Amino acid sequence: MPTINQLVRNGRTDKVWKSKSPALNKGFNSLKKKSTDISAPQKRGVCTRVGTMTPKKPNSALRKYARVRLTNGIEVTAYIPGIGHNLQEHSVVLIRGGRVKDLPGVRYHIVRGALDTAGVDKRMQGRSKYGTKKPKAAKK
């Protein structure tokens, strides 16, 4: 525990808080060509590369990912959730925060069903997470 004299000399400092999705905390003023500190829940970007990568040690799969250049000029790696996708280079996508635990360096998710990204086909449960519309009722 500090003495009164030590507190007078140095005082207490706040803990430094670090963002888990830093690219969403930067904006870009295109008129002044300057970066701004404006946070956003999602950001739009253009795919520069779409591919697959393998996860960390105990898991085994081919996880789909896209390299995305955001509107603020930052390029990030984002995970494509769900089974099957229609993304290719130059597709316009919406990204949100949220890491993928077994893919190092992937801190963002692509939002399915927004902009150029199609929803997951034939999905019946958890549709809102994968951008799938409600199926039409079958005729009797």
From Swiss-Prot:
Question: In terms of domain of life, where is this protein from?
Answer: Bacteria
Listed GO MF terms: rRNA binding; structural constituent of ribosome; tRNA binding
What cellular component GO annotations does this protein have? small ribosomal subunit
Keyword annotations for this protein, in alphabetical order, are: Ribonucleoprotein, Ribosomal protein, RNA-binding, rRNA-binding, tRNA-binding
A Pfam family of this chain: Ribosom_S12_S23
Q: Which GO terms describe its biological process?
A: translation
Assembly behavior:
Part of the 30S ribosomal subunit. Contacts proteins S8 and S17. May interact with IF1 in the 30S initiation complex.
Q: Which PANTHER family does the protein's record reference?
A: 30S RIBOSOMAL PROTEIN S12 FAMILY MEMBER
NCBIfam families annotated for this entry? rpsL_bact
Protein's job = With S4 and S5 plays an important role in translational accuracy.
As for family, the record states: Belongs to the universal ribosomal protein uS12 family.
Question: What name is this protein filed under?
Answer: Small ribosomal subunit protein uS12
User: What organism does this protein naturally occur in?
Assistant: Bacillus anthracis
Q: What is the lineage of its organism?
A: Bacteria, Bacillati, Bacillota, Bacilli, Bacillales
